[in-house]
Amino acid sequence: MLIALWLGAHATAAATVTTIRFSLDRAIDGAAAPFVLAASKGLFRTENINVTMDSAAGSQDAIRRVAAGEADIALADINALIRYRDREDAVPVKAVFVFYDKAPYAMIARKSRGIVTMADIQGKTVGLVEGDLAMRLWPAVAKLNGIKSDKVKIEKLSPAVREPMLSAGQVDAVSGFSFLSAINLRNRGVPANDLVVLRLADFGSEVYGHALIVNPTFAANHPDAVKAFLRATIAGVKLTLKDPSKAIDDVLAKMDGASRDLELERLRASIADNIVTDEVKRNGIGGIEAKRFAAALDQIADDFEFRQRPSLADIFDEGFLPAAGARKIN
């Protein structure tokens, strides 16, 4: 009788499902496939977590949601998190998993405007969206590549006109995500052979990209649920890598009238350039190397004055990561 009661209680505890409010940094597109698959293929459910998913209006909004307790976990730019954490009133939100080992920041330019490599940016006009972190890292990249920042004319734009202005030739280049703006421009009719994507990571930028961030109260109260979310995310990444073409079908079901070819290209670009990097192949997905993090902080400091320079432990908590073997990506 007692054994039966214990077994029943144990089974009930084991089956307890934790709800997680998850926020992407923007509307779903092809690059979100690992998270979409984790939901649609039951990977979250297998981990005894019930995940609700919505979208923020950029990384700063995603961080705000997590800090305010409106979301438990979110995908956000770790560089935006670093800047946020330097605020005196910052909630101690931390990243627990790096999704983009290389940040997708890039200069997207047209060859017909005389730009084929990063050095050609000097003397040109670059369209910049207010708050775009790509340009906040520009001083460090310019210095590394011998470019005089004061010789680059900055034109401030709204997000809605970034691609149209480059398409119309009103600016020579725009800053943005490599797998967003470049593919969007092709969709606007700009010939692929006239576009050049200058990824800042290819020109010396050391910063990491997007990461999963967690509300500190939720992390303290539900550590096993956070670990379960990371395991399901890794499973979603692996399933996506196995067959990107199949994965994109699940994404398209969540979008309205999107182009299959463009979203598949977006997914493949994010995989090749940002997720499956040489560092990830060596060490597995999700972690941070202390030496590279320190170098990234140095580069951020070229355009940002820290009140107090953070330590790696201030920004990233590796305690929720699965063992390295479980994070290996083939």
Q: PLM ranges: what are they?
A:
Residues 1-10:
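Bacterial N-terminal signal peptides
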Residues 15-168, 172-179, 198-200, 205-206:
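Short, glycine-/small- and polar/acidic-enriched structural segments
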Residues 40, 67-71, 86-89, 143-147, ...:
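Sec-exported extracytoplasmic/periplasmic mature domains
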Residues 220-303:
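Secondary-structure end/capping motifs
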Residues 293-330:
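Conserved C-terminal helix/tail region of periplasmic/extracytoplasmic solute-binding proteins
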